Amino acid sequence: LTERLSQLGAVTREARELCQTSGLTHFQSRITVKLGQKADAASLVPFLHPTPAVGCLPRDESTLDRLRDYRRQLKVPSFFGAPFGFIEPGGETTHLVVAIRGMAFEGNQVRLPSGCGIVGGSAIDHEWRELRLKREAVLRLLGLQS
């Protein structure tokens, strides 16, 4: 991500830290980009999405096509994970976060897709545990599980 963003200007990445939410602990990395030239928020989105957390590496058309195909097969909403944010009054500063969650409503049903990022050093049993914990936390938040 920082490599991609460096095409836009000077990138500063703070140390990864833990972010505690109700029931889950997430890793958080704050990244600041001092743009080389003025850009609007919409032009920044392709640099932010999809990240390796919800996307693929290498990030080329072939792997993105494969990712889209897998998501269709698994019935994952196409908007699962995306940049989210706001522009400060005056338009000089934009705050964006890369959201890796989603919710899709269809009739009287709701889909809450979840996943985990698999990389070379991943331990599959840890990834399954993380996935289970994520799903349970969301179910508790919605009052569907105690």
Give the ranges of each region predicted by the language model.
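Glycine-rich, small/acidic residue-mixed loop/short-helix segments
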Residues: G55-S146
